[in-house]
UniProtKB/Swiss-Prot annotation:
Superkingdom as given in the UniProt entry: Bacteria
Stored HAMAP family: RNase_PH
Task of the protein: Phosphorolytic 3'-5' exoribonuclease that plays an important role in tRNA 3'-end maturation. Removes nucleotide residues following the 3'-CCA terminus of tRNAs; can also add nucleotides to the ends of RNA molecules by using nucleoside diphosphates as substrates, but this may not be physiologically important. Probably plays a role in initiation of 16S rRNA degradation (leading to ribosome degradation) during starvation.
Encoding gene (name): rph
EC id: 2.7.7.56
Name used for this protein in its record: Ribonuclease PH
Keyword Cell cycle: no
Subunit-level organization: Homohexameric ring arranged as a trimer of dimers.
Amino acid sequence: MRSSGRKKEQIRPVKITRNFTKYAEGSVLIEVGDTKVLCTASIEEKVPPFLKGSGEGWITAEYNMIPRSTQSRKQRDINKLKIDGRTMEIQRLIGRALRSAVDMKALGEKTIWIDCDVLQADGGTRTTSITGSFVALVDAVNKLHQKKPFNVYPIRHFVSAVSIGIVGEEKVLDLCYEEDHVAKVDMNVVMIEEGEFIEIQGTGEIGPFSRKELDELLNLAEKGAKQMIQAQKNALKTDSLWIGTGRE
């Protein structure tokens, strides 16, 4: 039994609040345990120069932690005059994860900006950002679809992300900060509903880990990703019916 009382395969409570802010086409507050992230999706009727005239859209992401989202104040990136390596890595991960869910040709020449602002961090901020941003993305795309229906609905499948790791000798799902900072192995996994992988990030923090342990962790991740997708479906309700249909 973990210090939180959870079983090893149990995720933290998930709460997804849609339309959390007024102006963005999609906005979500996602809470996974004590981790809270505001995710917004904003639409621009243009694409980066390398896509002009291609007929394809683009999805890009920015990630930020507000100064007191952590136990001690974190300096804003703007005050350091550069984005730190961790932030850059995470926002690229979020962008890749969401682009993999979307038919860019069907989207057309539009850019969807995903902004993730961590309000409170207690482990799993990057995975929580992906899971919440997907819901914000669906809301934004649905608003486009309602204004002018797509010939082919561009979102192809659900995407979610979870963390897994080895703490002590136990393989556990959805690590909180207390577990994350002592984990022997720390992994983040992004998956689609059909059980296929988008990204696997894994590190032996103390030493190497075996193929058998890797397989066990990935099995655990699949269970967690399915639970996260169910939370997304519960939040979206009937607004998710177009996903994966490719229909008008």
